[in-house]
């Protein structure tokens, strides 16, 4: 009896689809912008992948990345809020759930924002609200289109209490000012 020598196949070539459970070639998934070639299931797209897919190559300039959430309530559930933030930053390589800045789409300048559900479910805390409001204000001042890709699902961030609830009013007011000016807003 003859046995063929087993070939070494590098890791990361294949992935299982959460939709149809098929094992699919990862390169095919990437070619379809993280969509399963078998069933059209949409895989999660990270912040950096979404920026790369949406904006012209290397055109994104991030703003306000140094903003860090405060812990005014000294909130604690299973762990302290400040420790949760550190853990989320290490896990996601993001400072917060929102990333905003300017970039180009087909050579046209836009203000671009994205919220990432992998960072505390993309919930809106004080930093997320401030970044979105500033992005809307910058787009209004520069008279640029504002595009926000919302990966949020977490609502207001309970760890910051009323501070996070106030962000909804702040962001809505900033976006309303843009709308009143008749500028393009896509979300």
What do these predicted ranges mean?
Residues 1-186:
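Terminal-region recognition feature
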């Amino acid at each position: 009896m003859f046995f063929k020598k087993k070939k070494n196949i590098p890791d990361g070539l294949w992935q299982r689809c959460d939709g149809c459970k098929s094992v699919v070639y990862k390169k095919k998934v990437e070619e379809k912008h993280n969509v399963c070639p078998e069933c059209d299931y949409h895989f999660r797209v990270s912040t950096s992948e979404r920026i790369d897919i949406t904006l012209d190559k290397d055109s994104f300039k991030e703003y306000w990345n140094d903003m860090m959430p405060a812990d005014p309530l000294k909130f604690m559930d299973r762990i302290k809020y400040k420790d949760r933030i550190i853990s989320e930053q290490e896990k996601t390589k993001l400072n917060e759930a929102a990333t905003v800045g300017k970039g180009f789409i087909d050579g046209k300048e836009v203000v671009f924002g994205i919220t990432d559900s992998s960072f505390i479910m993309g919930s809106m805390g004080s930093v997320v609200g401030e970044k979105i409001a500033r992005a809307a204000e910058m787009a209004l001042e520069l008279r640029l289109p504002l595009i926000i890709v919302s990966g949020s699902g977490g609502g207001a961030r309970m760890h910051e209490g009323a501070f996070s609830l106030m962000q909804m009013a702040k962001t809505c007011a900033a976006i309303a000012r843009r709308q009143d000016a008749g500028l393009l807003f896509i979300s």
